[in-house]
Swiss-Prot record:
High-level lineage: Bacteria, Bacillati, Bacillota, Bacilli, Bacillales
Gene Ontology CC entries for this record: cytoplasm
Keywords, in A-Z order: Antibiotic resistance, Cytoplasm, Magnesium, Metal-binding, Transferase
Protein name, UniProt field: Metallothiol transferase FosB
Binding-site list for Mg(2+): 7, 66, 115
GO biological process, one term: response to antibiotic
A UniProt-annotated Pfam family: Glyoxalase
Domain VOC: from-to ranges: 4-119
Annotated catalytic residues: 115 (proton donor/acceptor)
Assembly: Homodimer.
Species: Bacillus cereus
Function: Metallothiol transferase which confers resistance to fosfomycin by catalyzing the addition of a thiol cofactor to fosfomycin. L-cysteine is probably the physiological thiol donor.
InterPro entries per UniProt: Fosfomycin_Res_Enzymes, Glyas_Bleomycin-R_OHBP_Dase, Glyas_Fos-R_dOase_dom, Metallothiol_Trafse_FosB, VOC
Length: 138
């Protein structure tokens, strides 16, 4: 039986640039760095970076696939400012109802998508139950 997510691994083109992003933007703690890999601890989540220099990376922009991090509403604006100050690629977000809470989407240097989100699963389900009568809930 699956217990939890063990780790998340990202393919990166430039290890130094990626390390800078994960340390400075996501505030992950660098645990080990090799010639072609780096491991981080992000509040108990193991993030691995592995260098793959010659793979296509442009197609990733067409996918909604992303990893969302929970942040508080009080922290949201300061985290957004960190993204702006560090010239992180901020993506246009989708239209949101206030009940959907606050989000900002952005990418790392290799195009992997992330989101800072202030809502919870329960917030989202409650909103959908109130507004999306066509959905089936279990």
């Amino acid at each position: 039986m699956i217990q939890s997510i063990n780790h998340i691994c990202f393919s990166v083109a430039n290890l130094e640039k990626a390390i800078e992003f994960y340390q400075n933007i996501l505030q992950a703690k660098l645990l080990v760095k090799g010639r072609k890999l780096a491991y981080f601890d992000l509040n108990g989540l193991w993030i691995a970076l592995n260098v793959e220099e010659s793979i296509p990376r442009n197609e990733i922009q067409y996918s909604y696939t992303h990893i969302a991090f929970t942040v508080t509403n009080n922290e949201f604006d300061s985290l957004k400012e960190i993204l702006i100050q560090n010239q992180v690629n901020i993506l246009p977000g989708r239209e949101r109802d206030d009940r959907d809470k606050r989000s900002i989407y952005f990418t790392d240097p290799d195009g992997h998508k992330f989101e800072f989100h202030t809502g919870t699963l329960q917030d989202r389900l409650q909103y959908y139950k109130e507004d999306k009568k066509y959905m089936t809930f279990y």
